[in-house]
């Protein structure tokens, strides 16, 4: 039987961490100076005046490629521990990972067919 009392210190640690983070953000927001001027709002470029506007919009395809990379990078992060314990988890663990990989392959094929990976 799982005893949940063993997890109480972790819960206390997470609660205190959340409290300190919120307290620090709140104090910075309340007590921080709010005097923006032209120099503070301008981009810094090695001590020189900016040659062009530094706040150029990025193409949405960059974000799409980044999101796809994160998704498939997490896949490999799950594959390494699975490969280490495969002998101990048996056939159920094997087929569970095969279902996981099948879902990812279907998602990859969907993105490929939609043209998300083509760069024009």
UniProtKB/Swiss-Prot annotation:
Q: Which InterPro entries match?
A: NAD(P)H_OxRDtase_bac/plastid, NADH_UbQ/plastoQ_OxRdtase_su3, NDAH_ubi_oxred_su3_sf
Main localization is membrane
Q: Which Gene3D superfamilies match?
A: NADH:ubiquinone/plastoquinone oxidoreductase, chain 3 (1.20.58.1610)
> What subcellular locations does the record give?
Cell inner membrane
Question: Under which main EC class is this enzyme filed?
Answer: translocase
Bilayer-crossing regions: 10-30, 65-85, 89-109
Catalysed reactions, semicolon-separated: a quinone + NADH + 5 H(+)(in) = a quinol + NAD(+) + 4 H(+)(out)
This entry's Enzyme Commission designation comes to 7.1.1.-
Q: Which domain of life is it from?
A: Bacteria
Q: Name one Pfam family in it.
A: Oxidored_q4
GO terms, molecular function: NADH dehydrogenase (ubiquinone) activity; NADH:ubiquinone reductase (non-electrogenic) activity; quinone binding
Q: Does the keyword NAD apply?
A: yes
What are its GO cellular component terms? NADH dehydrogenase complex; plasma membrane
* Entry keyword set: Cell inner membrane, Cell membrane, Membrane, NAD, Quinone, Translocase, Transmembrane, Transmembrane helix, Transport, Ubiquinone
Q: What is the topology of this protein in the membrane according to its UniProt annotation?
A: Multi-pass membrane protein
Family as reported in the entry's similarity comment: Belongs to the complex I subunit 3 family.
Among HAMAP family, the record links this protein to: NDH1_NuoA
Complex and partners = NDH-1 is composed of 14 different subunits. Subunits NuoA, H, J, K, L, M, N constitute the membrane sector of the complex.
Put simply, this protein is called: NADH-quinone oxidoreductase subunit A
Q: Which organism is it from?
A: Coxiella burnetii (strain RSA 493 / Nine Mile phase I)
Q: Corresponding gene?
A: nuoA
